[in-house]
């Protein structure tokens, strides 16, 4: 973005266009849509016609996926700024659908452009489908309008039109039934929350310690059973699980018993769990590491140092960085950073696994000497949320380089831009 500000699209036009045609977010559901930020890169630029032509040409072939959502969001922004070509492309795309499926792709973008008239026509078409097939599942009103219009206002207007339009009446009736079901579910959820203690007592009656110990040797038993038991068990029951772990040799049973301590706090580093943290079976080893990572013990620091120095350390073992959370010591940052910097991170998923665990360590240990680790996350991790947390730590430690502070003011993350604009 800083290049665009200083030099325009020179040398980067193809890169920016490619990012418009294919979503670049690691996970747009968590990070949010990047379309407004991308649009700002070419809005009003001399290259706008090229971008508009490419985006409009891609709309008819767009799918209900992240790339398609990104394209249609861009086209919607262009249309709202007066691009008739983009508006027509979205209209043609939506109205060409037969409305008999569960999803109306691009509906909310069309509503943002054409408002209530578009909603009325979509409701009429969906109501026609319902009248032809009473069991048909159609798109819900909330998804047709998203945030473009106020739900209650739209529902009121559709209800007013229903008296003179049988198709709209059918759609309104279906929506009323659907949202009534949601209301009943919400009430049921509240009742379930109120009955949490009753369900906990019932679970413990049905899963006493003897049943849990027996289930450890049962191939069909589920992880959830052991984790919930651990969250509810008394200390005597937890001690009995530890006793069983000390003599259990079956890896599958050991892993299940370790899951009892997933949400139960250990008061000390038990020798058997310490031993299992170096088990040959990955599942057992990982389960033990999750348990002991919440403890502070000199042995854990030494284990953590061994793990990051192991040439086999990779994104698959990134969770081992959590061993430092409560066991970090001076000099460890050098080993951690060396382990991170020798990773190839050619794959976004690998870079994310490492970046997520690394920034978690920064937020747990909160030591300024980890600034190099936070900088690695900022440079390497594709997740804007992780990069935001890295910058927050660097600011807290007064270690944010000036050039990165300048970059952050133009970052793809709304939150990071907002954070930096609060800083003088």
Regions found by a protein language model. Name each.
Residues 16, 21-22, 55-59, 89-91, ...:
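Buried hydrophobic core positions in alpha-solenoid tandem helical repeats
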Residues 205-211:
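Elongated scaffolding segments in large macromolecular assemblies
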Residues 237:
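Alpha-helix-centered segments that form part of catalytic cores
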Residues 329, 342-345:
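Short, catalytically relevant binding-site loops at active-site mouths
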Residues 408-414:
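TPR/TPR-like (Sel1-like) alpha-helical repeat modules
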Residues 367-371:
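N-terminal accessory targeting/assembly segments
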Residues 1-11, 27-50, 68-81, 92-95, ...:
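Structural detector for internal amphipathic alpha-helices that build alpha-solenoid repeat scaffolds
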């Amino acid at each position: 973005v800083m290049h665009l500000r200083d030099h325009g699209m020179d040398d980067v036009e193809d890169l920016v266009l490619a990012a418009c045609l294919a979503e670049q977010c690691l996970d747009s559901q968590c990070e949010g849509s990047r379309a407004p930020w991308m649009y700002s890169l070419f809005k009003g630029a001399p290259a706008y016609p090229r971008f508009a032509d490419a985006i409009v040409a891609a709309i008819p072939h767009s799918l209900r996926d992240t790339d398609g959502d990104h394209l249609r969001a861009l086209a919607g922004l262009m249309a709202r700024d007066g691009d008739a070509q983009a508006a027509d492309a979205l209209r043609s795309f939506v109205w060409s659908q037969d409305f008999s499926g569960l999803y109306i792709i691009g509906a909310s973008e069309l509503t943002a452009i054409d408002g209530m008239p578009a909603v009325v026509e979509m409701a009429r078409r969906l109501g026609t489908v319902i009248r032809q097939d009473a069991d048909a599942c159609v798109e819900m009103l909330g998804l047709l309008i998203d945030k473009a219009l106020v739900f209650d206002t739209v529902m009121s207007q559709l209800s007013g039109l229903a008296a003179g339009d049988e198709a709209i009446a059918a759609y309104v009736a279906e929506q009323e039934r659907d949202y009534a079901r949601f209301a009943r579910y919400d009430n049921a959820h509240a009742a379930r929350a109120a009955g949490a203690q009753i369900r906990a007592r019932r679970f413990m009656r049905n899963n006493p310690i003897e049943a849990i110990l027996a289930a450890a040797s049962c191939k069909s038993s589920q992880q959830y059973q052991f984790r919930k038991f651990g969250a509810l068990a008394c200390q005597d029951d937890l001690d009995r699980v530890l006793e069983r772990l000390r003599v259990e040799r079956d890896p599958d049973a050991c892993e299940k018993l370790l899951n009892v301590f997933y949400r139960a706090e250990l008061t000390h580093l038990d020798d058997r769990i310490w031993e299992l943290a170096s088990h040959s079976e990955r599942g057992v080893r990982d389960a033990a590491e999750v348990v002991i990572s919440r403890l502070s013990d000199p042995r854990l620091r030494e284990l953590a140092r061994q793990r990051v120095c192991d040439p086999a350390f990779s994104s698959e073992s990134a969770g081992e960085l959590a061993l430092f959370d409560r066991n970090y010591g001076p000099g460890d940052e050098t080993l951690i950073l060396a382990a991170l910097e020798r990773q190839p991170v050619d794959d976004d998923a690998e870079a994310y696994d490492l970046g997520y665990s690394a920034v978690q360590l920064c937020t747990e240990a909160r030591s300024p000497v980890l600034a190099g680790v936070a900088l690695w996350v900022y440079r390497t991790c594709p997740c804007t949320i992780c990069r935001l947390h890295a910058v927050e730590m660097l600011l807290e430690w007064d270690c944010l380089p000036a050039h990165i502070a300048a970059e952050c003011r133009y970052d793809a993350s709304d939150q990071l831009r907002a954070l930096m604009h609060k800083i003088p």
